[in-house]
């Protein structure tokens, strides 16, 4: 069934530097023929919000499929944080991603939770890929999560959050399951959760 979906990246402002989370969709003849994307390049997307690649201090990819790391080659020596499991898979597994999107990047490999800047850290959220990660941002007005493709839609996240809540509140069984890391995210009491392929935002 044909569908249209966005492929989103996020910029996080911070007193110690600007963070870019995901860099857009890579280009390849077979990719373009199959997905028929209408791209906004990384430079153009940043310019639309009044910034540029030179303003980015750090970057991260939720995972290394071609639709999340397409702009990585433009980042030069900007450190790109990625789970070591994810990078290992991307380098070794055939047809996992477009190799040219990861060659030459300055990857900072992390294992598990890792702080990028004070109050901004990465947490593993495996499922879509074994090395998938999400970005946690602690703000004065509450916690915001950029969950990448942990879920394709905010509705899917809401279903898992409700399942988590039902288990927590000891509702009668049977109850649906949910990824174990949902508990860690919900313990942060997030005020908003953003996604890579859905413009909708989860809120409590």
Where in the sequence are the language-model features?
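Metal-dependent catalytic neighborhoods of phosphoester/phosphodiester hydrolases
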Residues: 70-76, 204
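Short, glycine/acidic-enriched loop or turn micro-motifs at the edges of active sites
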Residues: 25-26, 66, 86, 151-152, ...
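A structural signal for short, well-ordered beta-strand segments and their strand-loop junctions
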Residues: 20-22, 80-81, 146, 193-195
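Metallo-beta-lactamase
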Residues: 29, 38-67, 79-124, 129-202
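Conserved beta-strand hairpin/beta-sheet module of binuclear metal-dependent hydrolase folds
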Residues: 1-44, 134-152
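Short His-Asn-centered micro-motif
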Residues: 21, 61-62, 125, 196
